[in-house]
Amino acid sequence: MGRRPARCYRQIKNKPCPKSRYCRGVPDPKIRIYDVGMKRKGVDEFPYCVHLVSWERENVSSEALEAARIVCNKYMTKSAGKDAFHLRVRVHPFHVLRINKMLSCAGADRLQTGMRGAFGKPQGTCARVDIGQVLLSVRCKDNNAAHASEALRRAKFKFPARQKIIESRKWGFTKFSRADYLKYKSEGRIVPDGVNAKLLANHGRLEKRAPGKAFLDAVA
């Protein structure tokens, strides 16, 4: 018996059912890698960011997430270069899908109980996605902005329902806008922290501040 099509599980109808000690025998999700490309590049390397945003409330299978990751990574590697981007999958397939297998042979009514005790057994996993939730994000340099948008446009065909490609106003994957990031950096208040950045606060105990400085150090 083959895999049941994901269109049968597209709508969110029930409560979340994650893998646990009560829900055993769950197959591993197809997607195992969520960060692709130059994920170790600092926050200053890739200022541009674009998102693929879901426009419907639905279930997205782990197979669809893996297919979208592959096609987006392949296009960005071919067009922009393998060292010119960082792709991140922003949703995780924690919800367990179940199937109640039914026999279709002759005399099946003698062998099974139909819809009696029809809870079903785990078949696969999916991600529960809400309206406005980000599915994929790509950060890169400004000269590769068109390539990043095209890569996400191709990844849209791997998902059901509707999605939108939205250019972020933030600096990379951080929570700061471009103007604020450059302002804080010129003031010396930004401390790089991998793909994100920390903002030094201007409050705290006075004895921890260095003479002539208004902001605390990163270790304070």
From Swiss-Prot:
SUPFAM superfamilies, alphabetized: Ribosomal protein L16p/L10e
PROSITE patterns: RIBOSOMAL_L10E
Cellular compartments per GO CC: cytosolic large ribosomal subunit
Pfam families, per database record: Ribosomal_L16 (PF00252)
GO biological process: translation
Keyword DNA-binding: no
Recorded GO MF terms: structural constituent of ribosome
Keywords annotated in UniProt: Ribonucleoprotein, Ribosomal protein
Family that this chain belongs to: Belongs to the universal ribosomal protein uL16 family.
The protein's assembly and partners: Component of the small ribosomal subunit. Mature ribosomes consist of a small (40S) and a large (60S) subunit. The 40S subunit contains about 33 different proteins and 1 molecule of RNA (18S). The 60S subunit contains about 49 different proteins and 3 molecules of RNA (25S, 5.8S and 5S).
Protein name: Large ribosomal subunit protein uL16
Organism from which the protein derives: Zea mays
Gene: RPL10
